[in-house]
């Protein structure tokens, strides 16, 4: 049984991510929520934060987004975001640079100090793994 769901992130600059994934955790305006294949259809606003993508090989990728919206169907997730930054890289300096850009993006869009602290903690923890 194929338990993968199609996922894409689109910004004004174009498609940032597109592929089949196992699950996605999104920063909903009312809190984080996870989506697997077969999820009920919904549309949700998203706050600035981190999208956690679990790929088919169970590895995770993180993408920091500015606020946006998500449309979820049983077999597809589409995120429309104002901006997005990958939190990964091929070496330590690239990862550090992308991490700093992700933090700057989120900091520029949020005044909620508790949400900022939680998001930065998630980004820092991801760097350790």
UniProtKB/Swiss-Prot annotation:
Single Gene Ontology MF annotation: ATP binding
The entry's keywords: ATP synthesis, Cell inner membrane, Cell membrane, CF(1), Hydrogen ion transport, Ion transport, Membrane, Transport
InterPro entries found in the cross-reference section: ATP_synth_F1_dsu/esu, ATP_synth_F1_dsu/esu_N, ATPsynth_dsu/esu_N
Gene3D superfamilies according to UniProt: F0F1 ATP synthase delta/epsilon subunit, N-terminal (2.60.15.10)
GO cellular component: plasma membrane; proton-transporting ATP synthase complex
Keyword hit for DNA-binding: no
Keyword RNA-binding: no
Pfam hit, one: ATP-synt_DE_N
Subunit composition and interactions: F-type ATPases have 2 components, CF(1) - the catalytic core - and CF(0) - the membrane proton channel. CF(1) has five subunits: alpha(3), beta(3), gamma(1), delta(1), epsilon(1). CF(0) has three main subunits: a, b and c.
Function of the protein: Produces ATP from ADP in the presence of a proton gradient across the membrane.
PANTHER family: ATP SYNTHASE DELTA/EPSILON CHAIN, ATP SYNTHASE EPSILON CHAIN, CHLOROPLASTIC
Similarity comment: Belongs to the ATPase epsilon chain family.
Protein name in UniProt: ATP synthase epsilon chain
Species of provenance: Campylobacter jejuni subsp. jejuni serotype O:6 (strain 81116 / NCTC 11828)
Lineage: Bacteria, Pseudomonadati, Campylobacterota, Epsilonproteobacteria, Campylobacterales
């Amino acid at each position: 049984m194929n338990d993968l769901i199609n996922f894409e992130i689109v910004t004004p600059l174009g498609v940032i991510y597109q592929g089949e994934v196992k699950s996605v955790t999104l920063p909903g305006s009312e809190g984080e929520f996870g989506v697997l294949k077969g999820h009920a259809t919904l549309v949700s606003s998203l706050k600035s934060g981190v999208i956690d993508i679990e790929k088919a090989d169970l590895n995770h990728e993180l993408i920091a987004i500015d606020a946006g919206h998500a449309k979820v169907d049983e077999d597809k997730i589409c995120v429309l975001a104002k901006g997005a930054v990958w939190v990964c890289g091929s070496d330590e300096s690239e990862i550090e640079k992308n991490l700093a850009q992700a933090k700057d993006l989120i900091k520029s869009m949020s005044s909620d100090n508790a949400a900022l602290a939680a998001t930065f903690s998630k980004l820092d923890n991801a760097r350790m793994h």
